[in-house]
């Protein structure tokens, strides 16, 4: 069950530090192993996201009605979106050495989700938390604290760039749908 957050403000600043060379290598090594199973990992991430935060489905007419995780896993539309999400993440991870490229990719993602899809930016933070959960589970025995911190730093960097794009296009926080409350951020984690 979701909790309704207090005043969720886009103005709240996330830490946005560039990753060190060691952090980039740690993220890229983990990512390479995840990306080898791109579609399955992406589907696992989105299914968990939609099961734990069902209000996020409001932005997806093609599968907003789905409640059963197995039905979601089999959905061609969900699988396609999972591949798009993983592809965007792959572009970011592969270009961590190039801050301008990372910024450009995340600006495009942020602007599209703000202008075309009207997605509340908090869902990026929630989704990135789900991604970290899945990574931690996939590499339960091989996810040292340093790598976890590097991924947490990347999470902040992604959210910072995406919310900057929302601000750039003049995003105004949407009034929550009364039948589907917005999700809160997970209380645990970095």
UniProtKB/Swiss-Prot annotation:
- Stretches the record annotates as Disordered: 1-21
The answer to whether UniProt assigns keyword Disulfide bond to this entry is yes
Q: What is its EC number?
A: 1.14.12.-, 1.7.-.-, 1.11.1.-, 1.15.1.1
Its localization reads: Cytoplasm; Nucleus
Q: What class of enzyme is it?
A: oxidoreductase
Which reaction equation describes what this protein catalyses? Answer: Fe(II)-heme b-[protein] + nitric oxide + O2 = Fe(III)-heme b-[protein] + nitrate; 2 superoxide + 2 H(+) = H2O2 + O2; Fe(III)-heme b-[protein] + nitric oxide + H2O = Fe(II)-heme b-[protein] + nitrite + 2 H(+); H2O2 + AH2 = A + 2 H2O
| Listed InterPro entries | Globin, Globin-like_sf, Globin/Proto, Globin_lamprey/hagfish
Q: Cystine bridges: which residues?
A: 38-83
Describe tissue expression: Expressed in brain and retina by non-neuronal cells (at protein level). This is the major globin expressed in vascular smooth muscle and is not present in the endothelium (at protein level).
Query: What keywords are assigned to this protein?
Result: Cytoplasm, Disulfide bond, Heme, Iron, Metal-binding, Nucleus, Oxidoreductase
Binding-site list for heme b:
81, 113
Where do the Globin domain residues begin and end?
Answer: 18-167
What the record says about disrupting the gene is:
Homozygous knockout mice display marked vasodilation with lower blood pressure and systemic vascular resistance associated with increased levels of nitric oxide.
Q: Which GO terms describe its cellular component?
A: cytoplasm; cytosol; neuron projection; neuronal cell body; nuclear speck; nucleus
Q: How does it assemble?
A: Monomeric. Homodimer; disulfide-linked in vitro. Also homooligomeric in vitro.
Q: What does the function comment of this entry state?
A: Probable multifunctional globin with a hexacoordinated heme iron required for the catalysis of various reactions depending on redox condition of the cell as well as oxygen availability. Has a nitric oxide dioxygenase (NOD) activity and is most probably involved in cell-mediated and oxygen-dependent nitric oxide consumption. By scavenging this second messenger may regulate several biological processes including endothelium-mediated vasodilation and vascular tone.
**In which family does this protein belong, per the annotation?**
Belongs to the globin family.
> Could you identify this protein by its name?
Cytoglobin
């Amino acid at each position: 069950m979701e909790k309704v957050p207090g005043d969720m403000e886009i103005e709240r600043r996330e830490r946005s530090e560039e990753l060190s060379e060691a952090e980039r290598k740690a993220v890229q090594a983990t990512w390479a192993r995840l990306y080898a199973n791109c579609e399955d990992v992406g589907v696992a991430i989105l299914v968990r996201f939609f099961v734990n935060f069902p209000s996020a489905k409001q932005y997806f007419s093609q599968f907003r009605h789905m409640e059963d995780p197995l039905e979601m896993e089999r959905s061609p539309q969900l699988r396609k979106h999972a591949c798009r999400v993983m592809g965007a993440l792959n572009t970011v991870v592969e270009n961590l050495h190039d801050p301008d490229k990372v910024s450009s990719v995340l600006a495009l993602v942020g602007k599209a989700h703000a202008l075309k899809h009207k997605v509340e930016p908090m869902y990026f933070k929630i989704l990135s938390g789900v991604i970290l959960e899945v990574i931690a589970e996939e590499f339960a025995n091989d996810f040292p604290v340093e790598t976890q911190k590097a991924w947490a730093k990347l999470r902040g960097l992604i959210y910072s760039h995406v919310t900057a794009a929302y601000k750039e296009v003049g995003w105004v926080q949407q009034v929550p749908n009364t039948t589907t409350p917005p999700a809160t951020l997970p209380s645990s984690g970095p």
